[in-house]
Amino acid sequence: MSVEVDGFNASPLFKELNDGLADKAKAQEAVKAVNAIIVITLKNKEGKEQSWVLDLKKDGTLAKVDGAAPKGDVQLILKDVDFVKLANNKVNGQKLFMNGKLKVKGNMMKATAIEAVFKKLDPRPKL
């Protein structure tokens, strides 16, 4: 199942994350490190909302959500462009939160794990 959604700059990042989770050893490592279900809800420049569920509690999977976002251990709500910056280490999650650009519902400590997950599962070559 595709995790990409037209109109969202973060779609390629979710594809990369999904590709990283395809490596079961990496997926289990992420599950062990995070142990949470993270719901990521993004809003694009047209105002459309889309959610993805990152299951790092059981099996290390990523799924696009059709309809309302389900409840997870933590939900991250932010703009598409800000998520791209966060995932690419261009901005700190704490800074986004303090500036009101990142809303967190649920377990705040689990929310801090998302940056580490992207670093660990990033399939791009390290230069």
Curated annotation (Swiss-Prot):
Residues 43-52 are annotated as: Hydrophilic. Keywords: Lipid-binding, Peroxisome. Pathway: Lipid metabolism; fatty acid metabolism. GO terms for biological process: fatty acid metabolic process. The keyword Hydrolase does not apply. One of its GO terms (molecular function) is lipid binding. One of its GO terms (cellular component) is peroxisome. Residues 14-119 form the SCP2 domain. Monomer. Is involved in beta-oxidation of long-chain fatty acids. Its exact function is unknown, but possesses a nonspecific lipid-transfer activity, despite the absence of a cysteine residue thought to be essential for the activity of its mammalian counterparts. This is Oleate-induced peroxisomal protein POX18.
